[in-house]
Amino acid sequence: MNFSESERLQQLSNEYILGGVNSPSRSYKAVGGGAPVVMKEGHGAYLYDVDGNKFIDYLQAYGPIITGHAHPHITKAIQEQAAKGVLFGTPTELEIEFSKKLRDAIPSLEKIRFVNSGTEAVMTTIRVARAYTKRNKIIKFAGSYHGHSDLVLVAAGSGPSQLGSPDSAGVPESVAREVITVPFNDINAYKEAIEFWGDEIAAVLVEPIVGNFGMVMPQPGFLEEVNEISHNNGTLVIYDEVITAFRFHYGAAQDLLGVIPDLTAFGKIVGGGLPIGGYGGRQDIMEQVAPLGPAYQAGTMAGNPLSMKAGIALLEVLEQDGVYEKLDSLGQQLEEGLLKLIEKHNITATINRIYGSLTLYFTDEKVTHYDQVEHSDGEAFGKFFKLMLNQGINLAPSKFEAWFLTTEHTEEDIKQTLKAADYAFSQMK
């Protein structure tokens, strides 16, 4: 494929935009470098770049675009609302309608607040939990990404009794000292942290199904034990469902798994492609938030009519019969095809799939923990990524990310993807 115009525009972008991208994950640093492809438009399962190349898209903006690009029902809703006004700074009926649809789908959201990103949503749930418990420390799990606020950019200490350290320049040590990081799926490490820190722990922050070091399921009983141990300690359980809400079924992962948290943060999919975030949970906890309580959270753009309208339209598409069955079927076809090719070409790789989302790891073991992904073969992934890109298959440029299917992918797309993977694997020996 010819990428000359993308390369030219990336050079121009470097003159004006820091690093040439507005989010570091969009660079190709993690796959060996090179100029990122500059996209021009998207329709359904496909993206088109500035050089006229067409791609089957499995990046899907890192997850939000579950109904494909420019879905006609959502596009129409956005256009209609834009003609009426995009921001009023007042309550609207759309906020009420959208909140009701969300609570109908996710019953634990007894009360809801909208913000503008997943980062904001998680950041605020932590503040609310601290206000409710009158404690300061939180526990998070290694490898889970919860946005870029100071509160969660914290790396693990040497063990559950050790405080975290900043995972980014600019994060104060004083903030990191309020965070304990333990391995996901390691209930003994979690018990040890709770036993050591006791009544200092306000909340534990959990991805119920991990989506930030690929797709990883909790081990049987893990979430149930986290809930029990936490509540016995007076610690709140916060689920970060920014990736997982409406990803696997019409609702949240918590309902699919049958384990209910105290608070939930959501975003990505629910905005229909527009900026959105939100949080909600038990009424008595949510009443800590202003104007009813002392925990302050506000936002000029929060609950804006454009995002509310897009979110309503998105849920109207997803609540139709057969949507998630199709995603699961396509995901199964893709997984089975890739596994056959891995065996055919004797590639050291494994796959985790959860319905219409999967991750291909270049490692020889089933992935259940972050360390396994960190030690997987990043060089092999980078080579595979570029071989696929040059055949018109757009993946996330990182070994830690998932492939996302949409309602608009087809069986023919899967066949083309597997044909491309067959060639890519053949070049990796």
Curated annotation (Swiss-Prot):
Q: Which Pfam families match?
A: Aminotran_3
Name of the molecule in the record: Glutamate-1-semialdehyde 2,1-aminomutase 2
Ranked from the top, the taxonomy reads: Bacteria, Bacillati, Bacillota, Bacilli, Bacillales
Pathway assignment reads: Porphyrin-containing compound metabolism; protoporphyrin-IX biosynthesis; 5-aminolevulinate from L-glutamyl-tRNA(Glu): step 2/2
Q: What is its EC number?
A: 5.4.3.8
Q: Which family does it belong to?
A: Belongs to the class-III pyridoxal-phosphate-dependent aminotransferase family. HemL subfamily.
Q: Which species is this record about?
A: Staphylococcus aureus (strain NCTC 8325 / PS 47)
Where are the N6-(pyridoxal phosphate)lysine residues found in this chain? 268
Under Gene Ontology molecular function, one entry of this record is: glutamate-1-semialdehyde 2,1-aminomutase activity
Q: Does the keyword Isomerase apply?
A: yes
> Which GO BP terms sit in this record?
protoporphyrinogen IX biosynthetic process
| Domain of life according to the entry | Bacteria
